[in-house]
C-alpha cells in the first residue's frame, strides 16, 4: 500500500510540470488555416491551430 501512495505522489508531482511543447505566437486568427503559414514562418513547421483568437504552434 505504501508503494501505491508513493507512485501516486510521484504521478501528481510530474503532472504539475508543464511538459507541453506548444508555442503561442502573437498572431491574430479567426480559423486554424490562417495559422499554418504563420507557424511555418515562426517555428519552421506548419503545425498549429487557432485558439482564443491567437495562433498556437506545435514544433
Swiss-Prot record:
GO cellular component: extracellular region
Protein location: Secreted
Record has Signal as a keyword: yes
Record key words, sorted: Disulfide bond, Ion channel impairing toxin, Neurotoxin, Potassium channel impairing toxin, Secreted, Signal, Toxin, Voltage-gated potassium channel impairing toxin
Tissue: Expressed by the venom gland.
Residues spanning the signal sequence: 1-22
Site (Aromatic residue of the functional dyad): 58
Disulfide bonds: 29-50, 35-55, 39-57
Residue ranges, annotated region (Interaction with Ca(2+)-activated K(+) channels): 48-55
Gene3D superfamilies tied to this protein: Knottin, scorpion toxin-like
Role, per record: Potently blocks Kv1.1/KCNA1 (85%), Kv1.2/KCNA2 (91%), Kv1.3/KCNA3 (89%), Kv1.6/KCNA6 (94%), and Shaker (97%).
Extra facts: Negative results: inhibits with low efficiency Kv1.5/KCNA5, Kv2.1/KCNB1, Kv7.1/KCNQ1 and ERG/KCNH2. Does not inhibit Kv1.4/KCNA4, Kv3.1/KCNC1, Kv7.2/KCNQ2 and ERG1/Kv11.1/KCNH2.
Domain notes: Has the structural arrangement of an alpha-helix connected to a beta-sheet by disulfide bonds (CSalpha/beta).
Name of protein: Potassium channel toxin alpha-KTx 4.7
Annotated source species: Tityus stigmurus (Brazilian scorpion)
Amino acid at each position: 500500500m505504501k508503494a501505491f501512495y508513493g507512485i501516486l505522489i510521484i504521478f501528481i508531482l510530474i503532472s504539475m510540470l508543464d511538459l507541453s511543447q506548444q508555442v503561442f505566437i502573437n498572431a491574430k486568427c479567426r480559423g486554424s488555416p490562417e495559422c499554418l503559414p504563420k507557424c511555418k514562418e515562426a517555428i519552421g513547421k506548419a503545425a498549429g491551430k487557432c485558439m482564443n483568437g491567437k495562433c498556437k504552434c506545435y514544433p
